[in-house]
Amino acid sequence: MSLPVVLIADKLAPSTVAALGDQVEVRWVDGPDRDKLLAAVPEADALLVRSATTVDAEVLAAAPKLKIVARAGVGLDNVDVDAATARGVLVVNAPTSNIHSAAEHALALLLAASRQIPAADASLREHTWKRSSFSGTEIFGKTVGVVGLGRIGQLVAQRIAAFGAYVVAYDPYVSPARAAQLGIELLSLDDLLARADFISVHLPKTPETAGLIDKEALAKTKPGVIIVNAARGGLVDEAALADAITGGHVRAAGLDVFATEPCTDSPLFELAQVVVTPHLGASTAEAQDRAGTDVAESVRLALAGEFVPDAVNVGGGVVNEEVAPWLDLVRKLGVLAGVLSDELPVSLSVQVRGELAAEEVEVLRLSALRGLFSAVIEDAVTFVNAPALAAERGVTAEICKASESPNHRSVVDVRAVGADGSVVTVSGTLYGPQLSQKIVQINGRHFDLRAQGINLIIHYVDRPGALGKIGTLLGTAGVNIQAAQLSEDAEGPGATILLRLDQDVPDDVRTAIAAAVDAYKLEVVDLS
């Protein structure tokens, strides 16, 4: 029996080949050479690339035996994940390969900025000795604010604490209990800005976080603060930061990332108080080596038919055929539970009832977590990293089964509990020969509406004319109602309406609707 073929298309460290083991046949190809790549992939069971080789639909179509594409790095811009998923090809990357390098680089920038090391170095190289011109500031005894407590943010917090600093943090998706476990005081962003002597930013770049540290935020910081951004370009307003340094409010800064890259012209480059590097956070030999060995291990597992860490798509995973159709619905239930919760829940419970309870359904717990975190995490949320994300943010998750399901052959309930004891419950089922997804319950109120598209959920005071006001305001804004269903509260004057719309609802229209019908709660959720 021939060994599976692993095709390496880009230059990788020798340790990568060693990590693949002796149960595969390793071949090499010049991946950027399109013709050579297309000629080599038909016999490949696995394809390993870095950033130089493009793996698109054409390459995938030419590789009928391909089971896994492994990107030795974090980004996946050169891999068509959707095309791979459509062909049942697993896609993996190495999301944790550079976290230590990135954390250390942030600390290097902070230290260099606090002691004016680059400016002092340049001065001495000009054959001048100006000790008095380069007085620095200690980290010991100071308050360091970490904005974003993901994997890298936590590493920075742990390491900076060793300097004798007091660490505070802002992250709306980390529970106070989890922060306490880390020995970190959790603050609002405004409080962190006001208290921190140093601020290090470690957030993903999303519409909500872009420009987070802007002119207004900088004005709230302590005089003499030092700011570091080694996360994503655009989180810090570079022009506003330059003005704050020039004006003397901000003492210094360190940046490894910029809103536009490559960046060779910035007002920050003219300031001696600013330390800049050209996006070097992951540029260490160890990070590159780790990326190769990480994906090699994923390839080894995939070819052995085992569960694969760091998978970024569903289609390549091995899931029971009775359970597979429920994955997307339960993900949507997780999204819905998260949106309806006032804050990130501290616990998530998935109950499987009816015939489906006879199957192995652990993957549905992961699917619900994927949905819960997908709206707040920039990187791909996978069946493997979802539990780690939950652990990092202090969210527990469980799954339970019950054979009884009076109204449906099978139904899945997702229950989210907040730190304040608030509870959100949502339920869904599959129906018909096409296994259409349906929402059947939200917070004890019964529905029968397809789980798809943009949905507006309003819990409001049920008075005559309320529905007309909602329809009029949406219509005036050019938003079409595709489907709607009303469920009245069992007791009291309240009702909940679920409307599926043809587009998102502008913020001002949401505000107007909430005021018009005395809404207790109004949320828009994308269930596409």
Curated annotation (Swiss-Prot):
GO cellular component: peptidoglycan-based cell wall; plasma membrane
Sorted UniProt keywords: Amino-acid biosynthesis, NAD, Oxidoreductase, Serine biosynthesis
Record Pfam families: 2-Hacid_dh, 2-Hacid_dh_C, ACT, PGDH_inter
Function statement: Catalyzes the reversible oxidation of 3-phospho-D-glycerate to 3-phosphonooxypyruvate, the first step of the phosphorylated L-serine biosynthesis pathway. Also catalyzes the reversible oxidation of 2-hydroxyglutarate to 2-oxoglutarate.
Family classification: Belongs to the D-isomer specific 2-hydroxyacid dehydrogenase family.
Pathway noted in the entry: Amino-acid biosynthesis; L-serine biosynthesis; L-serine from 3-phospho-D-glycerate: step 1/3
PANTHER family the UniProt entry points to: D-ISOMER SPECIFIC 2-HYDROXYACID DEHYDROGENASE FAMILY PROTEIN (AFU_ORTHOLOGUE AFUA_6G10090)
Name of this chain's protein: D-3-phosphoglycerate dehydrogenase
Lineage: superkingdom: Bacteria
InterPro entries associated with the record: ACT-like_dom_sf, ACT_dom, ASB_dom_sf, D-2-hydroxyacid_DH, D-isomer_2_OHA_DH_cat_dom, D-isomer_DH_CS, D-isomer_DH_CS1, D-isomer_DH_NAD-bd
GO MF annotations, alphabetized: NAD binding; phosphoglycerate dehydrogenase activity
Domain ACT: 455-527
GO biological process, one term: L-serine biosynthetic process
EC number(s) recorded for this UniProt protein: 1.1.1.95, 1.1.1.399
Miscellaneous comment text of the record: Was identified as a high-confidence drug target.
Binding locations of NAD(+): 151-152, 171, 230-232, 256, 279-282
